[in-house]
């Protein structure tokens, strides 16, 4: 049976999840700015709970962004360190997709407009549709001002709004059937998406793991 570890530090939440012997174990905490100190102990505790060592892992899934730049870098650094040492592949997963998958799990919704507050008066935005239990991207993930967010051109039916970007709901033209602006990515849902990717043969070598920031400029431009 496949044994997968999933971890995410891209937002205020820090979470890990483990699939072993067909069972899922998770640990989730909202601990802003403590991810670097907490992540490895959380992984160690989860493995101990399952009674296995790191060598039992087949692959490691992680939140590749978009999200907080420091948080995304923490995940990449830890994943590459573990994967190099173990000679195991990795599974990069979009944090917007993880939000959509969580909305499916908790709310039973099949169409989700996922949005993460990107600061600088922008949101990370992606629209997802359920297919055989997996939330799949429709269109592209983007970073944009809330008022520019839109559903896919072929959109119909009801859409659910998930993520902190919906704190800008009054500026978003899309009117969802329901929303949860407090929802953060959870490694349990990252694990689900990572397992789908694993079974499709989409694992990559750790060296190829790259963050997806969506935004190139992270600092306020200097005056000329």
Residue ranges and their predicted role:
Residues 1, 200-204, 215, 220-224:
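SAM-dependent methyltransferases
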Residues 1-64:
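N-terminal beta-alpha supersecondary unit
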Residues 34, 89-185, 213, 218-219, ...:
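Surface "functional belts" at beta-alpha junctions
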Residues 46-50, 85, 103, 187-198:
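Stable alpha-helical structural segments in soluble proteins, enriched in small hydrophobic residues
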Residues 48-55, 83-93, 107:
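Phosphate-handling active-site elements
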Residues 61-90, 95:
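DPxDG-like acidic metal-binding loop motif
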Residues 180-212:
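Glycine-rich phosphate-binding/hydrolytic loop that grips phosphoryl groups
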